[in-house]
């Protein structure tokens, strides 16, 4: 019997690669995507495309309203998405507690499924300063997961897999390409339009374009202009 894993899938480049890795490691993948009030909801359409291309045992989309709080350029249209290039520090595109909420919901589903493994595509090398994309955060969440769940208390260790955490964007792209990921299906842009066309100037677009250039592969991203 295949081991079950819950895979967080945004529809972007990193999470698509993460799904491909989970499947290559023999996991039966249960994908979890989120509509949290993000302005770039085209990524949810992309997540569906990725699941259909790579395969998954199940794909669910959950709703939670972080737009009610705002506080991020991704959930509050009154805050502009930075376009001047990646800057030091934590950017306004950081969404407070987003990854913690997503991982907690993944943890709940994993327990119900009897899964001991959760995959998340966070990255600490080419990231834009997000505190919840660091190795320390992933390690701390895994510790919490094993303290706070029936499975963990009963001795069934839960593992949070972050296979991209130490990879550059170019290395992520090469890894995914080797596993058959079609990156034209993915959407990374923070302000993609309804057709999934990218702006080309936000931090996420810049990191993606630089990654493809460094990987020596053609960038299949669809840009608005």
Curated annotation (Swiss-Prot):
Keyword Disulfide bond among UniProt keywords: no
Catalyses which reaction(s): 7-carboxy-7-deazaguanine + NH4(+) + ATP = 7-cyano-7-deazaguanine + ADP + phosphate + H2O + H(+)
Cofactor note: Binds 1 zinc ion per subunit.
Pathway entry: Purine metabolism; 7-cyano-7-deazaguanine biosynthesis
Source domain of life: Bacteria
Binding site for Zn(2+): 189, 199, 202, 205
InterPro entries (alphabetical): QueC (IPR018317), Rossmann-like_a/b/a_fold (IPR014729)
Required cofactor(s): Zn(2+)
Keyword presence, DNA repair: no
Gene3D superfamilies named in the record: HUPs (3.40.50.620)
Cross-referenced SUPFAM superfamilies: Adenine nucleotide alpha hydrolases-like (SSF52402)
Binding residues annotated for ATP, in chain numbering: 9-19
Key words of the record: ATP-binding, Ligase, Metal-binding, Nucleotide-binding, Queuosine biosynthesis, Zinc
Coiled-coil boundaries: none
GO BP term (any one): queuosine biosynthetic process
Main EC class the enzyme belongs to: ligase
A single MF term (Gene Ontology): ATP binding
EC number annotated for this UniProt entry: 6.3.4.20
Summary of the function given for this chain in its UniProt record: Catalyzes the ATP-dependent conversion of 7-carboxy-7-deazaguanine (CDG) to 7-cyano-7-deazaguanine (preQ(0)).
Membership in a protein family: Belongs to the QueC family.
Protein name: 7-cyano-7-deazaguanine synthase
Native organism: Dechloromonas aromatica (strain RCB)
Source species taxonomy: Bacteria, Pseudomonadati, Pseudomonadota, Betaproteobacteria, Rhodocyclales
């Amino acid at each position: 019997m295949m081991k079950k894993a819950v895979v967080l899938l945004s529809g972007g480049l990193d999470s698509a690669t993460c799904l491909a890795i989970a499947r290559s490691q023999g996991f039966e993948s249960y994908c979890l995507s989120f509509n949290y009030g993000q302005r770039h909801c085209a990524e949810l359409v992309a997540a569906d495309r990725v699941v259909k291309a790579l395969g998954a045992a199940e794909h669910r989309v959950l709703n939670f309203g972080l737009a009610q709080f705002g506080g991020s350029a991704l959930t509050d249209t009154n805050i502009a998405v930075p376009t001047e290039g990646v800057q030091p520090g934590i950017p306004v595109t950081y969404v407070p507690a987003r990854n913690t909420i997503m991982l907690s919901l993944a943890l709940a589903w994993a327990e119900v499924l009897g899964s001991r493994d959760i995959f998340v595509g966070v990255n600490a090398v080419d990231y834009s300063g997000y505190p919840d994309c660091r190795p320390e955060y992933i390690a701390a969440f895994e510790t919490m997961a094993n303290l706070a769940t029936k499975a963990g208390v009963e001795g069934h260790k839960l593992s949070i897999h972050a296979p991209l955490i130490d990879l550059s964007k170019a290395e992520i792209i090469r890894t995914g390409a080797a596993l058959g990921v079609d990156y034209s299906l993915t959407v990374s842009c923070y302000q993609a339009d309804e057709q999934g066309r990218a702006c080309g100037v936000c931090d996420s677009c810049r990191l993606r374009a630089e990654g493809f250039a460094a990987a020596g592969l053609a960038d299949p991203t669809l840009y608005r202009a």
